[in-house]
Amino acid sequence: MARKTPLNRIRNIGIAAHIDAGKTTTSERILFYTGVSHKIGEVHDGAATMDWMEQEKERGITITSAATTCFWKDHQINLIDTPGHVDFTIEVERSMRVLDGAVSVFCSVGGVQPQSETVWRQANKYGVPRIVFVNKMDRIGANFYNVENQIKLRLKANPVPINIPIGTEDTFIGVIDLVQMKAIVWNNETMGAKYDVEEIPSDLLEKAKQYREKLVEAVAEQDEALMEKYLGGEELSVEEIKKGIKTGCLNMSLVPMLCGSSFKNKGVQTLLDAVIDYLPAPTEVVDIKGIDPKTEEEVFVKSSDDGEFAGLAFKIMTDPFVGQLTFVRVYRGKLESGSYVYNSTKDKKERVGRLLKMHSNKREDIKEVYAGEICAFVGLKDTLTGDTLCDEKNAIVLERMEFPEPVIHIAVEPKTKADQEKMGVALGKLAEEDPSFRVMTQEETGQTLIGGMGELHLEIIVDRLKREFKVEAEIGQPQVAFRETIRSSVSKEHKYAKQSGGRGQYGHVFIKLEPKEPGSGYEFVNEISGGVIPKEYIPAVDKGIQEAMQNGVLAGYPVVDFKVTLYDGSYHDVDSSEMAFKIAGSMAFKEASRAANPVLLEPMMKVEVEVPEEYMGDVIGDLNRRRGQINSMDDRLGLKIVNAFVPLVEMFGYSTDLRSATQGRGTYSMEFDHYGEVPSNIAKEIVEKRKG
């Protein structure tokens, strides 16, 4: 079976936005106009094609990125829907990693919101070119030009409108295409499937000319030949303008900006045209970095059908009918269903049972998958998110994704004995799907703890246990992931010696313990010379310290951000062993930590609260009571925005408190930012409670 769509006509794009900017509705309309859906699914009635998990239908927010294939004007668009809620940024990170381009959707009223800034930063981090779609132009208070300014000021980007609205709110009927200099007006009878191309209305001609001039100037800056033509007063052709927009979009010096109203079926076709005109094909993005596992050298993978297969698993889902689906972005070569593939990250061979192309929640079996495609593999047992799949003879490990550590834990207890076994299996499956979700057993109590990125994240996990796996579970109070660190440098020795008949134990070490920069982790330095401790025992000392650092001396929390230097010691020919040195390392570390001024750290959340002005004083007072540090205060569309760092432990139940303090008019978002030192009076309480 040959490839149906040439590589240069494929677009792998994501739709990224803040909650309620209308992202799912926009994806829906794309599927409707490209002929994949027959009836439009509205988020309001819980029937959107992309939102296919039960809870998403209920909450009206998108949680997992479903990958969908659709076609537009001889091009294949692989659409990845990304969640807009801050607890799910890991999902967004994951999809950014495998996208070639993105459509950022902004609400014409709300503009740039906190989550949009986070998603924008992630897209910058992975170098993803994007276009902006200003949605909801039919809403009261819609203002396209406001959003343009916010993108400049808040996101420090260079938005260049390629179409501007005709009318606004109730009178929004279409757009002016600044490239062709024509008006495009949608008619309501055909649900926006048909539109008329007309002359520009006279009252908008001046504004259109002014914006066209800005567009042409931005395009001319992309190319010397175009610049000369522009400065010489010559007209640029439509083709030249399009080429210039694409160049600027790909090198990220400009962001093409369009508008519409997905809900009212206006502006979606012009958005699709922009996707194929300006966003990159797999062949137009930089080559993907990888490492040759044999030589550890850097290698680059060029997107093409030639060459051995290479792909990245970026998402795992459990499908009720097929079992486990592994979503893979193919970068090079091709693969047939039924063949074997090598997982170079795990060094294991896997057999691919079936290859499925997903159309939101319908699926079609395909025989073969090619470079540039996104496809679900069925039958992989050991492959997890972030693993590389490739050809064994030409192995490569593609750049890994980094997953954040959980900041909040909740104890879960199965209600009955029958739930106990099911719960273990279910939590294992959920942890495979979502790398930012962790499951662990608390040693002292034997309780199962689940960890995640926020309260909503864990709520949804518990909800899925009930719905998908039929496990009834009780949940405990949320617990915060505290950490410990040290503030001063200390040197200590420890001699571990046991001589009680038979073979003894002997390990003797001198270590220096030093604090490191926040967030820099653990470092072990070996400065043993002259063989005072034989080489084979050095890793045992390191291992002893790594085990001991899991339980700090203050309150038994993991110790972070320190450096240990092993600089002296001694050994015994007969009695020394790895075990003895492991114990010596562990004891020396504990003694040194006690003397190194240990302190408790807690997760600090970046909180953004949006409230009407009259509640501002109460909200700030409340954040101060929660030990918050106020960083800035801004205005946005008649509301006050307060930015603060607040300890996570003080934020439980905040949504209820904020709602009652502002009569339901305040909203907030929070995400983990950094670990900060706990004030000593509060640290004392926490330590006593732990030891109590």
Swiss-Prot record:
GO MF term set: GTP binding; GTPase activity; translation elongation factor activity
Domain tr-type G: 8-283
Superkingdom of origin: Bacteria
Subcellular localization, as worded in the UniProt entry: Cytoplasm
A Gene Ontology cellular-component term: cytoplasm
HAMAP family the record matches: EF_G_EF_2_B
Single biological process term from Gene Ontology: ribosome disassembly
Residues where GTP binds: 17-24, 81-85, 135-138
Protein's UniProt name: Elongation factor G
Sequence similarity: Belongs to the TRAFAC class translation factor GTPase superfamily. Classic translation factor GTPase family. EF-G/EF-2 subfamily.
Family annotation (SUPFAM superfamilies): EF-G C-terminal domain-like, P-loop containing nucleoside triphosphate hydrolases, Ribosomal protein S5 domain 2-like, Translation proteins
Function according to Swiss-Prot or TrEMBL: Catalyzes the GTP-dependent ribosomal translocation step during translation elongation. During this step, the ribosome changes from the pre-translocational (PRE) to the post-translocational (POST) state as the newly formed A-site-bound peptidyl-tRNA and P-site-bound deacylated tRNA move to the P and E sites, respectively. Catalyzes the coordinated movement of the two tRNA molecules, the mRNA and conformational changes in the ribosome.
Keyword check for Nucleotide-binding: yes
Keyword Cell inner membrane among record annotations: no
